[in-house]
Amino acid sequence: MKKAMAILAVLAAAAVICGLLFFHNDVTDRFNPFIHQQDVYVQIDRDGRHLSPGGTEYTLDGYNASGKKEEVTFFAGKELRKNAYLKVKAKGKYVETWEEVKFEDMPDSVQSKLK
């Protein structure tokens, strides 16, 4: 009986790990130890989607510090300024925070992509 419980526990743990690896959304990515946090730099180049009762959701293409293209989706409590540059702290599809930055403060590899 103890062997069966141990095997069942190992199979359950393996199922949870496989689920974290193959199913990506903002909740699973937040806790997945295999996904690393990175800064993604974006420019507000289009309108966001207004949500009820308030706030705006943005889905934008941006670039990480090495210049790799990434898509991020995040929420803002208000509509953001057009053409503003943001640094988004993302871990997969999970966005922890965002902040407005100056163009000069972004890495050179990102500046060349967002001109």
From Swiss-Prot:
SUPFAM superfamilies: BC4932-like. InterPro entries: DUF1093 (IPR006542), YxeA-like_sf (IPR036166). Induction: Transcriptionally regulated by YxdJ. Induced by the antibacterial protein LL-37, probably via YxdJ. Keywords: Signal. The keyword Cell membrane does not apply. Residues 1-29 form the signal peptide. The keyword Signal applies. It holds the Pfam family DUF1093. This is Uncharacterized protein YxeA. It comes from Bacillus subtilis (strain 168). The lineage of its organism: Bacteria, Bacillati, Bacillota, Bacilli, Bacillales. The gene is yxeA.
